[in-house]
Amino acid sequence: MNLILMGLPGAGKGTQAEQIVAKYNIPHISTGDMFRAAMKAETEMGLQAKSFIDKGALVPDEVTIGIVRERLSQEDCVRGFLLDGFPRTVAQASALEEIMKDLGKKIDYVLNINVDSGLLLKRLTGRRICKECGATYHLEFNPPAKADVCDKCGGELYQRSDDNEETVANRLDVNIKQTKPLLDFYDELGYLKSINGEQDINKVFADIDVLIGGLA
């Protein structure tokens, strides 16, 4: 099964990715992991990526796509994979189609975990972190026993500056605008499957499981 996982920040992609790879024994391939592995192994594309990163420059698409090609050609991807964080643009998605064709494979599903942006705002702005021990809480989903005080060490809880409402709202807005063309692209190809991410996390996985179970 060859899958792509999509969803806005706070949609719960990480949790679902863990459950998918654990049950179906396929590699979870994130963009960051791909780059780190390629640079560590000093592959041709990894060395090219390193030269851009060391200069503080953006890695061009052709290098990123080359790294994806290298990674998907590896033996652990024979039974399938879960791509996370790639593609980000329609140009990258088109290049991925070519890679899959060259490998004699196809993308089975693009799973988009759908959550209303108002709920995402609540999820993302409710996070609180202990100044002393780093324990994480959520005002609604995992509140401390006593307001603004860490249950574990009694330290003061704070909200990270990038978790404030304005910053989060802007981040979501940018993500929505960036992902829409990609979702439209995959919808036209018939790959796109929308998953209700507003349910309990186990129900979200149950819905994914029903959908992809036939591919195993």
Swiss-Prot record:
Q: Which residues bind AMP?
A: T31, R36, A57, L58, V59, G85, F86, P87, R88, Q92, R160, R171
Q: Which UniProt keywords apply?
A: ATP-binding, Cytoplasm, Kinase, Metal-binding, Nucleotide biosynthesis, Nucleotide-binding, Transferase, Zinc
Query: Coiled-coil stretches, from where to where?
Result: none
Region called LID, residue ranges? 126-163
Q: Which residues bind Zn(2+)?
A: C130, C133, C150, C153
Instruction: Name the catalysed reactions.
Output: AMP + ATP = 2 ADP
Q: In which pathway does it act?
A: Purine metabolism; AMP biosynthesis via salvage pathway; AMP from ADP: step 1/1
Entry keyword annotation includes Transmembrane helix: no
Major place of localization? cytoplasm
Its Gene Ontology cellular component terms are: cytoplasm
Q: What is its EC number?
A: 2.7.4.3
Location of region: NMP:
30-59
What Gene Ontology molecular-function terms does this entry list?
adenylate kinase activity; ATP binding; zinc ion binding
Q: Which residues bind ATP?
A: G10, A11, G12, K13, G14, T15, R127, T136, Y137, Q199
> What InterPro entries does its record include?
Adenyl_kin_sub (IPR006259), Adenylat/UMP-CMP_kin (IPR000850), Adenylat_kinase_CS (IPR033690), Adenylate_kinase_lid-dom (IPR007862), P-loop_NTPase (IPR027417)
Q: Where in the cell is it found?
A: Cytoplasm
GO terms for biological process?
AMP salvage
Assembly, per entry: Monomer.
Per the record, the similarity remark reads:
Belongs to the adenylate kinase family.
Briefly state the protein's biological role. Catalyzes the reversible transfer of the terminal phosphate group between ATP and AMP. Plays an important role in cellular energy homeostasis and in adenine nucleotide metabolism.
Entry text on domains:
Consists of three domains, a large central CORE domain and two small peripheral domains, NMPbind and LID, which undergo movements during catalysis. The LID domain closes over the site of phosphoryl transfer upon ATP binding. Assembling and dissambling the active center during each catalytic cycle provides an effective means to prevent ATP hydrolysis. Some bacteria have evolved a zinc-coordinating structure that stabilizes the LID domain.
- Protein known as: Adenylate kinase
What is the organism field in this record? Bacillus cereus (strain G9842)
